[in-house]
């Protein structure tokens, strides 16, 4: 389905990003595993892909750094000659009630989650415009749609990702580039592992399907949006959340 496609996935060393990288590679894409934390985790993702017959490389880069993102994209283009799929998944949380939230906690979350998404799109778009093709998939969150107590920074960043998605779809669509977002709900990752059992149980009670999502649930949606089956879909936010009662 994605043979000969080059895909960059940010924050691909764990969780949703890891699942997306593995899923895209399974469909034939050659993936670039971006990471900024554990090199060992990135190596594990690369090894998993290669053991399954796929192709992958690794690139360490802090996506909140504009110049570093520019260098990363240039290196990818130099290595492969093209970039077909960009998945903006890198994200962090620093939760806290607004009256206790530190300025640096607000800034750091927006710098990674929102500015990081802008940075990679900004530098990837030039190549995709030349190609007159490309798939950009931004990972948002239902927190950016519904809001969530204790997540003023995270919700604001993910709402910003939705606004950025809709605007970029309008700007880039005439050159054959689609831009969509996925808004996951509760997903079993390290981000949700820190939740107490009581909070998890209460959350599951609000989800009509009765469970947290799996990273693969999000990855399957990303594979669809990256494929030619989604060529006529752009400027959409696909909510993957098991239907939360609010």
Residue ranges and their predicted role:
Residues 141:
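Residue(s) in the substrate-gating loop at a strand-loop-helix junction
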Residues 173, 178, 233-235:
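Short, small/polar-rich loop/turn modules that mediate ligand/substrate recognition or access, typified
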């Amino acid at each position: 389905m994605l043979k000969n496609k080059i895909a960059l996935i940010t924050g691909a060393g764990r969780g949703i990003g890891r699942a997306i990288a593995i899923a895209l590679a399974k469909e034939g894409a050659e993936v670039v595993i971006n990471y900024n934390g554990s090199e060992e985790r990135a190596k594990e993702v690369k090894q998993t892909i290669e053991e399954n017959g796929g192709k992958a490389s690794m690139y360490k880069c802090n996506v909140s750094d504009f110049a570093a993102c520019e260098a990363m994209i240039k290196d990818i283009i130099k290595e492969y000659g093209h970039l077909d799929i960009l998945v903006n998944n890198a994200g962090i949380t620093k939760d806290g009630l607004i009256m206790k939230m530190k300025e640096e906690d607000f800034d750091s979350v927006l710098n990674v989650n929102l500015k990081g998404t802008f940075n990679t799109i900004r530098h990837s778009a030039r190549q995709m415009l030349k190609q007159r093709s490309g798939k950009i998939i931004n990972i948002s969150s239902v927190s950016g749609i519904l809001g969530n107590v204790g997540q003023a920074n995270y919700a604001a960043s993910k709402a910003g990702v939705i606004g950025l998605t809709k605007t970029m779809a309008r700007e880039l669509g005439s050159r054959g580039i689609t831009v969509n977002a996925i808004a996951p709900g509760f997903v079993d990752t390290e981000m949700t592992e820190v939740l107490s059992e009581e909070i998890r149980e209460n959350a599951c009670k609000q989800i009509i399907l009765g469970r947290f999502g799996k990273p693969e649930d999000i990855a399957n949606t990303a594979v669809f949006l990256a494929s030619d089956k989604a060529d006529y879909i752009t400027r959409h936010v696909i909510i993957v959340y098991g239907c939360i009662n609010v």
